[in-house]
Amino acid sequence: MKNYSAGYIREQSLTMNNYVTEAINLKSYNLNDADKIILMYSKENGLIKGVAKGIKKPKSKLGARMDLLVANTLQLLKGRSMDTILQAQTVNNFRKTKEDIDKIMLSSYVSELVVNLGEGSEAASEEIYELLYKDLNRIADSTEKKDALIAVIKFQLKLLLIMGFCVELDTCLCCRERVLDEEMFFSSQMGGIICKECNETLGVKLKMHHKIRDFLQAMLQFDFNYESDYDKKANEKVCQVCFNLLDEYIKTHTNKKQKTTKVIQELVAL
């Protein structure tokens, strides 16, 4: 089979019914005995679906390019109800992830987040695509479980920010004053932190250590690829607390329950 370059694919997209995009495979569904539907997140159009014809046949021209968690440059043919994938050139198959079950599960979690939250995100599609790509790459290249977990936590925070569900970590949601005390509380329902004084009335039960708050602020504020002192000093226990807190927040504010959450919770508890 010819190995087409991304540039070649773009040059061949000459008709109005054809288009080219870069996309990451998130889910697949059986369509019939030979074909599959691939759900992808694309740089230009957000969530898209495409039919991979003949993908189940041994000599399929698309082959492993349609595996989950693979980034491709694609040429697609627009259809009335479903587009068809004509050509694909792999940009990154995140090979190191496929060799490690923990990395597979963490990558599956972030891809499921995009599936659950990505509907209607076309205006921010390039930003979300780049964030997803960086995160999958960071998970693949991580050498310690802690580093892979930090990548997931950064993704949770930054995707929530893009989608308009940002966690409030600086000021009390009740009195709107900056929380400077070491003692504070966290409310998933309200969307962030509550100061000690206000909580005497509210009665939020979940205490948040100020170091957890500081860690989350750093993960949200710094560039994705920047390794801060917080990254270096964090341990798996800190990551476990932060992951669970953010996952509960996501479930509360989006009404979307992640199917992979339980597996990840078991993974970080090991």
Q: What are the roles of these predicted feature ranges?
A:
Residues N3-K36, Y41-L270:
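Non-catalytic alpha-helical scaffolds and adjoining flexible linkers that form interface surfaces
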